[in-house]
Amino acid sequence: MKVSIVVLNFNGINLLKKFIPQLIKNSNGYDIYVVDNNSSDNSISFLKTEFPEVKIIRNKENYGYAGGYNSGLKQIDSDLFICLNNDATFLDNKSIENIVKVFEKNSSIIAAQPRIINYSNKDFYDYAGASGGFIDLFGFPFCRGRILNHIENSTSYQTTREVFWASGACLAIRKKSFESVNGFDSSFFAHMEEIDLCWRLKNKDINNKIVVIGNSSVYHLGGGTLNDNSSFKYYLNFRNSIIMLVKNLPKRMLFISLFGRFLTDLLILVFSILTLRFNVFFGLLRAYSYLTINVFKLKRVKSNNEYYKFYYCKSIFYNYFFRSKKIFSKI
C-alpha cells in the first residue's frame, strides 16, 4: 500500500518549524507532502532549505481546508492519504504504522482517525476529534471523550471502534473513497468539512466503515490557522453544520431536525448576549444571513434511510444541560 502523509499549511512557518522535524522522525519513510495555500510568510523557502525531503505542492490562493486538500490531493499518487494538521504530531512511529495496518487488514474501512490528544495538556483529549466523532439529531458534533466543552481524560476510550466521523486534525482516507464522493465540499472552506465528507461516504454505502484507531495517537495544538475565539470560526461552524444537515439528512427527518436546530440556535443566540460572547453572537447572525440569502442554492445528496444505525437520534444539548450527561459513556 502506497501511503502519503499530507500536511496543509497557510502562513504556518512557526508551526512547521515545531512539528515537521517530529513528523519526519516518526514517518517510517512514507512520503511527506506539504500543501501550501499560497502562504506569504516564507513557509515554502523554509521547507526547501531545511527539509528538502519534504515534497511541496503550492496552491495559487488560500482555498481553505476543504479546497486546499482537494487541490493538493489530486496531485498525489497514493493509495492512502494521512491528512495531518500543521499543528499536530504523532506520538511515535508506531502510531502511523498502526493506522496503515488497519487499512491493510480491512478493506471495508475507508476512513479513520487516531486518538487526538491535547498537545498542551496531554492528560486530556483534544477538542477536535478526541477518540472519534458522532453527531446528534440537530447536527451538533460531539466526540468519544468530548461532549460540547467537557473534555475527558486521555487514558479513556483506547479501543478501536466504528464512529460517525473522523477528525480533520488527522484524517486517514483511501484515495478511491475520497474521489468517489468528489472529496471535500470546497464551499465549506473550513470546519465541518470532514463530517460532511464522512456522512456522504455513509450515504453512498452504509457498509463503509469509519473508525477510531485505539493504538494510534496524535498530539494536537489547536487554533493553528483560525483562532478559537474568532467570529469567523463560529460563522463557519454554524453555517456549515446546517448546510450539512440539508445536504445529507433523509427527507422525512429534515423538518424536525432543522426546526429543532433553529430553536437550539435561538437559545445559543440569547445566551451569547447574556454572557457577552459577541463573537458567537455575530458568527451565528452571519451564518443565518448567509443561509437566508442562499437557501435555494443548497443542494442535497442521496441520503441513506438507514442513517439511524450510525446517528445519535437525540439532542446532545438537552442531555448535557438538562440531564447533566457530560461523559460519552453515559449518553
Enumerate the predicted regions with their spans.
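A short, conserved alpha-helix in the catalytic core of glycosyltransferases
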Residues: Q158-S217
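A recurrent flexible, glycine/aromatic-enriched loop bordering the glycosyltransferase active site
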Residues: L137-C143, L148-I173, I195-L197, L226-D228, ...
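Conserved donor NDP-sugar-binding/catalytic core segment of glycosyltransferases
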Residues: T89-G129, G133-F140
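Glycine-rich, basic loop-to-helix element that forms the pyrophosphate-binding segment
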Residues: N59-I76, N86, D92, N98
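Short, acidic, metal-binding catalytic loop of nucleotide-sugar glycosyltransferases
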Residues: P21-Y30
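A conserved acidic beta->alpha catalytic loop
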Residues: I13, Q22, D36-S45, E61, ...
